[in-house]
């Protein structure tokens, strides 16, 4: 086509030259009126004009839908609501050039996918070939080694080797085939994933082009997070692909719970698709916790103290309390979640549930305080501690009284010792410390305590009485403490004394005299005349010299509480026997559950002393409370730490006591069922010293029977106070004072409440009166006593009473309205009541032996001749406590 000028073209288009020049300028072509126009320029102008004159690039359709909704209202009326739904949709006309560009991009993307697919396939084939080659090389190497190893047995193994080789080649081929299949499957999955991503990206680009500008700006962070997750997924795949050899085949295999098998974006898309609606479009991912429930039980290290509650044990093992209770029930123990159990039980339960137990020592503070003591190094000889034991009234206190040249026995109630007396005596050959123990049965614990704190036991046996029960008990205590025994045969001055009998009786219990080849010294003494006292002291010192008794004299003291009581003016008082070290006034002592500073010390004569060495008994003042007899006394440095240790011991004692109280034991079930049928004697006991409280409590508790039980409601050391009287009134108890009295306020309460208050100074009287009170609570014993026998001689019929037996009274007396038994051939066939008794048609109340009478038995007519009617009565016999 030839070129035309602007003027010619303007004439053809029927427009002015100026307008055509302006249109060329708008199309980007500068022309004047005389210039020529080429065909290409003309086409450019036509395209420009078509685009300018064409319709709009964007078409928006709006649609409105109106409807009416009836809503039920109050009072049964319905309400109409007008609803208008507006929908808006925009269509965009694409530019041909833009369409060509998108088509080119789509083509490039497909080519990239094909290229990636080919590369992945080639890579998988190379890896499979290398894997097969490596396995074949290793197989060949193993075969060569086996061939060298079995060269001497080639003939026998040729067939097996060929079969093995064929099998291995087959396995290698199978492995290669599996590797290729895995690679192919991975390649297909990768291709599907790439295609899915491309499709999703195309959809996103499409909707991104159509979206409003405000929406683009609001989705900026979403798009950024998507790209970040895609980059993270890509890096994860690269890391997984580079780890180890032959991991590609394993990675292609889908695993349960594999979090990296698909990208995070895919997982979020799946969750959004499930939700649906507008929420289906992902707006961003929240932080998610990847916690998984443990698949197996976690075994823990459980630290257990000396006591622990069931709930605390469950928390340490990270299980529910009900599981611990079930485990304890399987082991045969019933417990509640707040019950305190001991360390051994907790260890068994924890080990039963599969945990490792670590036992913790809770007395570290106590050990630290005990170790921080200044004890001397040099041990020096010390005086022996001698305990005088024997049966009651065998002369123990009188013997010691003669040694001390004082009258101690006159001060004891009833002439019997009821406390442990501690005295030290200076002799010509040295000093001796004596402990005088009670002899009667109630003071077993005091006697055992004396044996534990002693070096030598002097066993006093009366020559006229011989070996008695408390003598045997004293021998057992001495043997248990492994203490040598010196026998003092007392009352040798009496005419009926028989020392040889004492030797024979003691030999039955392992106490042999030296002249018989034994180890015990026998000394004949008389506490009344003073015979043999010097020989006894020499025997004691000789035995002490054999024992080589030594103790550290310097340093902090330690010892034992022999006796303790509460003095109204001085407070808690403890009799302490020092074992080693020197006890000074002002020392800080730790004594069982109590502690304090020694404010004063007195010897057995009541004199103030400033210090006491080994084997010296003293009374100390200043403790926080009355200690238990037998407690260890230790001097410590720090009063604050001593207080902490004392409080810790109190708490531990309480916890252990609670742990041992099994409220739901099966063996107590029947006892609890019959508890309402048992009478109780409640007692509030107060005594002057701790040892007497123990002895009386034990003796009273031993009096309990199946029908009457003794219950010690409260006990203590010191006088009877208003609190004790109030406790006795509340529990309906008997107030018992042993060598103590009630104060004025307590007496007012006792008079107002009319309480039973009893004072005693001898334990025998106390026990006898409690026995009498218990006997009054016993139900009387019913006894049947036969009072007469009557033999049936004949039987008559009476219209009023039926069969009447004509009888002869053969024994005793037959009384009217008494219970009877009918005996036939000495076998009881009926038991009932005698209804009618007549003699010569007259009603009588009784018929004596040898007389005839008529007897009518109530509700019984089968009386025969020859039967015997036995008449008896029931009497009540009051029982007593043995």
Curated annotation (Swiss-Prot):
Annotated compartments: Cytoplasm
Biased composition (Polar residues): 67-81
InterPro entries in the record: DNA-bd_dom_put_sf, EF-G-like_DII, EFTu-like_2, IF2_assoc_dom_bac, IF2_II, IF2_N, P-loop_NTPase, Small_GTP-bd
Compositionally biased tracts (Basic residues): 244-258
Annotated region (G5), positions in chain: 526-528
Annotated tr-type G domain residues: 381-550
GO molecular function term, any single one: GTP binding
CDD domains given in the database record: IF2_eIF5B, IF2_mtIF2_II, mtIF2_IVc
Gene Ontology cellular-component terms listed: cytosol
Biased composition (Basic and acidic residues): 92-209, 259-272
Residue segments, region G2: 415-419
Residues recorded with modification N6-acetyllysine: 800
G4, as annotated region: 490-493
Top-rank taxon: Bacteria
Keywords in alphabetical order: Acetylation, Cytoplasm, GTP-binding, Initiation factor, Nucleotide-binding, Protein biosynthesis
Region (G3): 436-439
Family: Belongs to the TRAFAC class translation factor GTPase superfamily. Classic translation factor GTPase family. IF-2 subfamily.
NCBIfam families: IF-2, small_GTP
Name of the protein in question: Translation initiation factor IF-2
Protein source organism: Shigella flexneri serotype 5b (strain 8401)
